[in-house]
Amino acid sequence: MTLSSLAESLWWIIPGKLGGMRKPTADQIPTLSQIGIDALVSVMDDPSNLDLYEQTQIPYLWLPTTGGQSPTVEQIEQFQQFVDAQHALAKSVVVHCSSGRRRTGTFLAAYLITKGSSAREAIQAAQRANPQIELRDAQISFLQELSSHLGVSF
């Protein structure tokens, strides 16, 4: 897969700062910085690629989440802390799962909720950024519960 096809799979929910994509292949990992990716969050339920992230010295966080399922509130807290720390260093962060549409969309929408967006606003922002987002009912419910937990109205 070429650099341009890798760039085409990348989408930004906060332009140039926070985005999503499908899982990068081993040969793409060394080129991530060329398309503006400084740090990664893997939400795959297996540790694939983590050793490659270490070898290429790209900052990463692994928050294993089963496909079609929701993360935990604790995972969202870890995610927010990692993203905020990377942003403080002027680094962009990209989240990936297998396809970059369900778990990735859930985490990115959750981040917006932690910053004050309602669940509805966060889901709409994710869908505008990537119309192929396919959140499951459990993921939508989680985002609504997170919004309520954080005191943000629906």
Predicted regions and their residues:
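Short cysteine clusters
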Residues: 97
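Ser/Thr-glycine-rich phosphate-binding loops at phosphate-binding pockets of nucleotides
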Residues: 104
